[in-house]
Amino acid sequence: MHPVAAIDFGASNTDVVVRDGGATRHWTLPTEGQPDEARIRRVLEAGGVSPRDLAWIAVTGGNRALLPSAIDDRVLHRVDEV
């Protein structure tokens, strides 16, 4: 089973969580600009992860609707904020 990721694009910070089997990793980066494909790649690479390593990616936070529906054939699931 491939790992999965969730990214929260906040106003000040971008939080990333990757679940790989029984292990969960988390890291936070300062938010820089609007979310786009390049930004997703940068925040994942900060944790040593590529979109190709993942089964899918969930995204939430501001302007997630601007993101493509997939990156490297990995579906981006847009999650509404609560």
Summary of predicted features, one role per range:
Residues 3-42:
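Short glycine-rich, Thr/Ser-proximal phosphate-binding strand/loop in the N-terminal lobe
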